[in-house]
Amino acid sequence: MKSFFKPLILKKFLWTLLFVFIYVLGSKLTLPFVDVSSIAKLNGDSVTLNYAAALMGGNLRSMSFFSIGLAPWMSSILIWQMFTVSKRLGFNKLSMESQEKRRMLLTLAIALIQSLALVLNLPLKTVVGVGQGTIVFLNTLILIAGTYFLIWLTDLNSSMGLGGSIMIVMVSMISYIPQDIWLSIQELKISPLILALIGFFSLCFLYLAVLVERAKYRIPINKINIHNRFKKYSYLDIRVNAAGGLPIMYAMTLVSIPQYFLMLFLFFQPNNRLLKEGILSLAMGGIPWFILYLLTIFILAWAFAFINVNSDQIAERMQRSGEYIENLYPGEATRRYIHKIVGYFAFVGALYLVLVAGLPMLLIFLDIRYMRLGMIPGMFMIFIGMVFSIKDEVDTLTLNDRYRSLF
């Protein structure tokens, strides 16, 4: 806690407060020519989109400047990482500037689809002298501009503040999701005893989630020509859940993308029954949505584990620095061994996330009103990962302050 009161950390924290204030202010600016009184209907029909937007710094409840949030940007980063992991595609050989341009173009494409799908399904006001096409174009442009403004804001926060894009997402989650959970508790008329039990099990799960988040598997590492009688090994740490809570957050967003496409097609074919059924089946509470959600979490957890712990890079780095694992040749043998260990923990972590995020969501098949309560474990996983990420950043920034000068 002392680290937080260091001048550098306080300065960064104040900058972050300013950026958060700008974000909150922008989220209150409603889109022009939108019938705000009729937005509630869209929110009721698009619960999946509401939660997906909230997990990416967006807000579909008020249809504001930042309604689609960072979803296009974060989705493009994920897709790009999937491509760059494979050396065969050659994307990792591109210059950083070329990679950034391609990511931004991908962000623009995703933002255009999401913005257009939302605007075309918004209840728009009739304004004399202003055509519907002009209103659609203007609001689509505003939403895309809002996304790029948020990207710029998170870049500023990364360089001047704390947490980068994490802070925007955390503020979005804190602003809306606890309120939704409390409304569900009131709507379901849950008794104080059941509420106390939910609170107790939530605390138990929070403790378990923190343990799993920080749990690591250590591989002893030797270094050529270094002999230390006090410490025989250094270690390569591999987290048990290497993906963290990111797969749950990204899964909600990726599962919502098909809905945006269907909403876009529905505007051009409003009487198409298949499109309407597709939107309903992909909404929260449907079996197709549930299966797709869990499958996406499993795949993302597996993928993130190999992205976060790249066996190729680790093996190459160890070979260059003269490090080796006992009874293994440097190079290919080391790479295969690390890849095997990462694969094992990737499966364990993916299974853990599916159980944590999936089992509580079974409540929605009893009553859709349990949906918000069923999402509590998943929200805990996401939030814990964000908190520890900020803590690690603060620890890194104050690392030099832990050593005292000799003179």
From Swiss-Prot:
Record bears the keyword Heme: no
Gene3D superfamilies xrefs: SecY subunit domain
Single GO biological process annotation from the record:
protein targeting
Q: Name one Pfam family in it.
A: SecY
Top-level taxon: Bacteria
Q: Which family does it belong to?
A: Belongs to the SecY/SEC61-alpha family. SecY2 subfamily.
PANTHER family referenced in this protein's UniProt entry, alphabetically: SECY/SEC61-ALPHA FAMILY MEMBER
What name does UniProt use for this protein? Accessory Sec system protein translocase subunit SecY2
